[in-house]
Amino acid sequence: MDTSTVLEKYTQDLSNLPLEVRHLLEEIKSKDVQVSEARKRYQTRDHQLHKFIRTNGTLTKHPKEDQLYSKIEEDMKLVQKLQKEKILLANTALFLISKHLYHFETDIAKLERDELLPPLEHPIELTEVSKDEYAKSLNGFSDSASATPTPRNGSSATPVAETVKKIQKKKLSVKGASSSSAQSSSASRQVKRLRSEEIEDPLPYEGGSLAFNGNVAMSINSAADANGPNGEDADNNLYCFCQRVSFGEMIGCDNEDCKYEWFHWSCVGITSPPKDDEIWYCPDCASKMEKRKKKRKN
């Protein structure tokens, strides 16, 4: 690796990053508008009920009380759903930026160690804090899809910090359990999941940049020292619609020609593992198959 290779690599890797982050921020803004509208609706209905009580007393029931309460509950659930989606989008942006920043800093450090790049007069050290924040962003990203909204308080530094207060114990994904990414995709897709009770105490994996223990935490220190910036055994392939690396729980599409192959549960709206004999197609493949069926009928 030399300086020109690193420059070319990161020029290419970062070319789409601004557009990706901009798209994520626009999605968050759009959901913010939906949240605001839903809040106005249930607050208006709540005001109607309180106004009726002030006028007629608590013993007289509003003629549309049940209907109003049902609508209020519906809008509140919608707000909770949208807030979870906003957290997921924010963590996606954090993950993308953190990933590129970490690999860039480690590559620069390697070039300086090999004396291919003169050190800066005031070098930006890859501190323990930045490593911990990078690990936290990855773990927090996996948790955010299933996390319940947490009220903000004065002690929270950022919204992301609120979502990662308590790291849940994750199941080892089928993708992560594969011995090699080069295994036959048709064989690996036959096993959709690996139940958590079968791996109650998985052994830590220390060969690559990701070290899995009971909490699927990232051991950045040992990975950077042992195998360099990227890790020899790490699976750096990109999967799913979000085009990110494998993490958390994933499901494989049963279409052998699927260009994405594996999907994060949160990205395809899955909350529980499929049955062993259940066939599952990703939304993209399912849509294409449906279009082909319609063409045949016509």
From Swiss-Prot:
Protein name according to UniProt: Chromatin modification-related protein YNG2
GO molecular function, one term: zinc ion binding
Binding, Zn(2+) 1: 240, 242, 264, 267
Natural source organism: Candida albicans (strain SC5314 / ATCC MYA-2876) (Yeast)
UniProt-listed CDD domains: ING_ING3_Yng2p (cd16858), PHD_ING (cd15505)
Highest taxon of the lineage: Eukaryota
Transmembrane feature ranges: none
Gene responsible for this protein: YNG2
Segments of skewed composition (Polar residues): 140-158
Site for Histone H3K4me3 binding, residues: 239, 250, 254, 262
Chain intervals with Low complexity compositional bias: 174-188
Function: Component of the NuA4 histone acetyltransferase complex which is involved in transcriptional activation of selected genes principally by acetylation of nucleosomal histone H4 and H2A. The NuA4 complex is also involved in DNA repair. Involved in cell cycle progression and meiosis.
Keywords: Cell cycle, Chromatin regulator, Coiled coil, DNA damage, DNA repair, Meiosis, Metal-binding, Nucleus, Zinc, Zinc-finger
Pfam families to which the protein is assigned, alphabetical: ING (PF12998)
